[in-house]
Amino acid sequence: MSKIRVYELAKELNVSSKDLITLLMDEFGVEVKNHMSAIEDEEAQLIKELLATKPEYVEGSLEDSKSLVDEYEEILQNELNKAKKKRKKNKREDKDDENEELETEVIEIGETITVKELAEKLNKPSNDVIRTLIFSGVMAAINQEIDFATAEKVCESYGVILEKLEVIEELEAVEVEEDDEENLEKRPPIVTVMGHVDHGKTSLLDAIRKAKVTDTEAGGITQHIGAYTININGEEITFLDTPGHEAFTAMRARGAQVTDVVILVVAADDGIMPQTKEAINHCKAAGVPMVVAINKIDKPGANPDRVKQELTEHGLVVEEWGGDTICEEVSAKSNLNIEKLLEMVLLTAEMLELKANKERKAKGTVIEAKLDKGRGPVATLLVQNGTLHVGDAIIVGSTYGRIRAMFDDTGKKIKSAGPSIPVEVLGLSEVPEAGDRFNQVKDEKTARIMADKRKDKEKSDSLMSGNRVSLEDLYSQIKEGKVKELGIIVKADVQGSVQAINQSLEKLSTDDVKVRVIHGGVGAITETDITLATASNAIVIGFNVRPDNNAVAQADKENVEIKTYRIIYDAIEDVKSAMIGMLEPEYKEVILGSAEVRETYKISNVGTIAGCYVLNGKLQRNAETRVIRDGIVIFESSLSSLKRFKDDVKEVNTGYECGLTVEKFNDVKEGDILECFMMEAIKRKEL
């Protein structure tokens, strides 16, 4: 039977706990110690009926209690007599309860709380709380988490009410907010420029923006992630100036799909280089369309046709050769064909039908963030949907804030920013990380609570092992439906080995699991490989190469598996063995034995007992059994009991008689054949 606490009932009835306790003890004879005591639902219902008939009780008046009791005299006579005897005894307790109620404290927690945090909320020494837990049968250290029910027992012993923190607007609900088709409008494409070092990525952005930022950057390497919006023929394009593909993939690893189109810059005199190849693989893994810009075509030794030939080797066939990859020959230095390249970007974006709803709450991604001495945490946000205004409350990853000021890419103060517009904002509580998602919420309090919840979740997630794919747990992850594809990154000492391993691995694909080599390259296993593996939930296989120290540290941090081999066959066999373990075993039926029913006996509360003679093999108790009549299987079940004379036995061999019952089947007749069998699992040895 369910119960309700006194203070909860008092709150429902809009009376003080003190008055309710008096009513319970004096008029109903229900003995309660204080406002934390629990009473039966039946008694609570009776009190509700009493107060419903006499609303003056709700005002806190107890003077007319005698006349009310008269109305319920028959029901309550026994309780009244008991209550009179207990009044004197409970007077002192009532006084204590009054004082206790005045000091009653209510604290709120989430699903779990550490012992230390609970002690701080109760304003009690940690040792006292640990002692209370031990008396409750819970052994917990100071930094150990306890659940809500355990914390509630501790609080009850201190006379404190514990309430579960009210969940305010889950971020997931904000993320999946759907837009009406009629509210969607065309938005500018977001473009990332990628390519090998010194192939002219920043120079190309210079030519596009008509501003010389290259000269201010050391060594020709971009020093930061910037975001700029340009206007061409009345249409806008937003460019993210990333240091190659590392930031692109790092953001994707954090769940942020920012880029709509990638401009792949390839120098006409150099052709496809290792970082170009990496950029291509990263784009393919992310499923982002590419527009190839063959740069430096005005340079001596430029050979655009060789570049196009090399592109085909990586699955990118240009349009003029019958493929679907848009390719433009440009020169950032002499500003040649830049307009044409941008038109191709807009054409690609048009095919993608990029739309957003600027009327909804804003959401997007952090492009970069830093701590400024004078301005505090500063973040560059890319609005991907909705409109962001100064004064909006936002949650960004596990931090939050209210936007105090907003600047565009030229440093000009603005009041709002729509879809695909990058802005720099002030007002966050902490510095977020690049790739963090941001969402606008109704107020700062909501943002703070959601950020705290996110921090708690991150803390609990960090205590649990990551769910990255490894060869050892591949089978269990497949069964749980977590993995449908095994992504592999291959690094080897020579290109021939890379190609050999790639071809061998991809041949292992089955209907259940596809093996996909995301990236193959020559050289040591680096941080870049681990970053790509993190983003793609892949494993890294090295042949005659080793990971560097930074790669090992990052792999440990991200729970990415690195396997190194000296023999190609071993690498193939390891992946094959993991996949064979994933395959469902084949089952073969093994006949144990059969028996003929010679007599049947019906016994009440037991059913039909069959007296049988074992013809061949043996019968086993609990074995799968089929009942065959005139050569036709009429029922399949199992042997629920098996006896020889009066003794229970596990099995009966050929030539012996026995008595048995078939589970859930009583229609056994003389002449029936009972066949015992088992299904034997046979491990798959081939894919």
Swiss-Prot record:
Cited CDD domains: IF2_eIF5B, IF2_mtIF2_II, mtIF2_IVc
Region (G1): 195-202
Entry-linked Gene3D superfamilies: 1.10.10.2480, P-loop containing nucleotide triphosphate hydrolases (3.40.50.300), Translation factors (2.40.30.10), Translation initiation factor IF- 2, domain 3 (3.40.50.10050)
Region of interest: G4: 295-298
Signal peptide: none
Keywords: Cytoplasm, GTP-binding, Initiation factor, Nucleotide-binding, Protein biosynthesis
Protein residues bound to GTP: 195-202, 241-245, 295-298
Recorded superkingdom: Bacteria
G2, as annotated region: 220-224
Domain annotation tr-type G: ranges: 186-355
Region annotation G5: where it falls in the sequence: 331-333
GO CC annotations, alphabetized: cytosol
GO molecular function terms attached to this record: GTP binding; GTPase activity; translation initiation factor activity
Ranges for region G3: 241-244
Localization per record: Cytoplasm
Function: One of the essential components for the initiation of protein synthesis. Protects formylmethionyl-tRNA from spontaneous hydrolysis and promotes its binding to the 30S ribosomal subunits. Also involved in the hydrolysis of GTP during the formation of the 70S ribosomal complex.
Assigned protein family: Belongs to the TRAFAC class translation factor GTPase superfamily. Classic translation factor GTPase family. IF-2 subfamily.
Protein name, per record: Translation initiation factor IF-2
Organism: Clostridium botulinum (strain Alaska E43 / Type E3)
